[in-house]
Amino acid sequence: MEFHQPLFQRARERGLIPFTSVYDPRDLDFIETLGCPIYKIASFEMTFDDLLATTAQTGKPIILSTGMATLPEINHALEVLDKNNAATIILLHCCSSYPAPLGSINLNAMTAIGNRFNRLVGFSDHTLGSIAPLTAAAMGAVAIEKHYTNDPTPVSYTHLTLPTKA
């Protein structure tokens, strides 16, 4: 967790707002000392009730990724977050492939989950280029997460497939 401090500092020096994904409630105490203004919870954590409750109790906005979650899991996570007085929640639509072909992202699903759960929506973009995030914004996304790398040479599946520019 110590690697967060220099990253948060560097982001702030550049006028950015740093935040992080949390995977364990025990990590929140440390991350809170950094003044993290918002948290992201990965889709595979939708049934980790302790993490959901503890994150909600910070009173900070939460970005809830839905990429690998089922509708019942999303509903469950929202019930836990609401029960624990979560602040603003953004449901982040995601196609969990790298890179994601434009034809696979189904941005209608983004608006559908927003309507179904009466929540703000965003889009986690794994496509190449800017068409998908611009379209998502036009369709009502209030948050866009764009995956990219500044160096595609590391031996890693995601690094080899990510664009080098946002």
Region locations from a protein language model:
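Catalytic cores of alpha/beta
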Residues: 30, 72-77, 129-139
